Amino acid sequence: MPNNQYPEFVPVEPNWNQNTVAVQAGRPARFAGAPMNTPVTLSSTYVHTTDLGYGRDGNQSWGALEEVLGQLEGGIATTFSSGLAAATAIADLIVSGGTLLVPTDAYYGVKNIFARLEMHKRLNVRLIDLENTDSTIAALKGADAIWMESIANPTLVVADIPAIVNEAKKLNILTIVDSTFATPLRQRPLDFGADIVLQSVTKFLGGHSDILLGAVICKSNAHAEFMLKHRHDFGAIPGGLDAFLALRGLRTLAVRLDRSETNALEL
């Protein structure tokens, strides 16, 4: 969502569908001579008149991308240098020594992160069969957070997110959904009550195999502020050109998804 680090954007109308939001959100406010696209910002430092003073604090290109992702997911987006950098930021949110439930078929890079954190006694990791909703719900007791990946990469397992989130909330468990394969045009986990969504922008959102980017979309302001602080402190920032290219990819996301689904059904 917009903040005082970035210029104003074209307002998103309540009656726009998701396809229109993907095309129109994040464009600069319109005035005579204004560009239709947010220009690429390549700068390490800024004039100290706002919170945007140094390159780790923000970038106008990120801001436009975060505006689109936040609008599409229904939350507050923070972008990172890769999907795994975004996953690491989420892991940092979990209390030290806390128990994290992770699907057995989660993306290998994510499992590597959690294995390393467990090795250093930062987290306790318990593996779950996310496809089995009953056993997943039974495993919630004693956990601090649950990581769901739906649709899973590459097994294509689909989780019953609403049912699992509903039970997790009763136990005050942090709920995280990697929704990369679904994209926000096919699934919005925050609408199901999840706390946090991960998107590897590298994949469908970027769509052209020419960038590495990740994003964390949070429902609460507190979690969003934590992500901003983590990015500033750890420095896993996206490049301005990468953000620009991701925006370009988002503009065609709807038609690319439609064609992919048509081709899959034909096959």
Where are the regions that the model predicts?
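Glycine-rich loop-to-alpha-helix module at the N-terminal edge of alpha/beta enzyme cores
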Residues: 64, 68-72, 78, 85-86
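N-terminal "arm"/small-domain region of PLP-dependent enzymes with the aminotransferase-like
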Residues: 2-61, 65-68
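Conserved PLP-enzyme active-site core in the AAT-like
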Residues: 2-14, 24, 28-31, 77-267
